[in-house]
Amino acid sequence: DCLPGWSSHEGHCYKVFNEYKTWKDAEKFCKKQGKSGHLVSVESSEEGDFVAKLISENLEKSHSIDFVWTGLTYKGRWKQCSSEWSDGSKIKYQKWGKQQPRKCLGLEKQTEFRKWVNLYCEEPQRFTCEI
């Protein structure tokens, strides 16, 4: 069972937050939402579709190009992708968009929140938590 305002999928609970935070602050915020709380990790095509629909339905409209943080970051000075999501789960599914030299990953509105894009970690974005 999920808390009020959260959506359930495959034993996890998800919520889209319309406030803007850096990747690090969004991850800290998600950790405070509940036991095992983290930025969303997309571990299958089905989960990706669920998350994309949830974001599309719950993200407040804006006139800017919208991105939503995921729990994936690059680690190390060569910007190699980390081998796990911020919640510690392994990467079993990938859906990359155009790659650029940025270290934090988000979902892009132009792809209906289905493709992953590299973003600057310090640039505030909206985000989705998973618990």
Swiss-Prot record:
Residues 1-131 form the C-type lectin domain. Expressed by the venom gland. InterPro entries: C-type_lectin-like (IPR001304), C-type_lectin-like/link_sf (IPR016186), C-type_lectin/snaclec_domain (IPR050111), C-type_lectin_CS (IPR018378), CTDL_fold (IPR016187). It comes from Echis carinatus (Saw-scaled viper). GO terms for molecular function: metal ion binding; toxin activity. It is found in: Secreted. Anticoagulant protein which binds to coagulation factor IX (F9) and coagulation factor X (F10) in the presence of calcium. It may bind the gamma-carboxyglutamic acid-domain regions of factors with a 1 to 1 stoichiometry. The dissociation constant (K(d)) are 6.6 nM for factor IX (F9) and 125 nM for factor X (F10). Does not bind carbohydrates. Disulfide bonds join 2-13, 30-129, 104-121. Belongs to the snaclec family. Heterodimer of subunits A and B; disulfide-linked. The keyword Disulfide bond applies. It holds the Pfam family Lectin_C. One of its GO terms (cellular component) is extracellular region. Its main location: secreted. The keyword Nucleotide-binding does not apply. Ca(2+) binds at residues 41, 43, 47, 130. Keywords: Blood coagulation cascade inhibiting toxin, Calcium, Disulfide bond, Hemostasis impairing toxin, Metal-binding, Secreted, Toxin. This is Snaclec coagulation factor IX/factor X-binding protein subunit A.
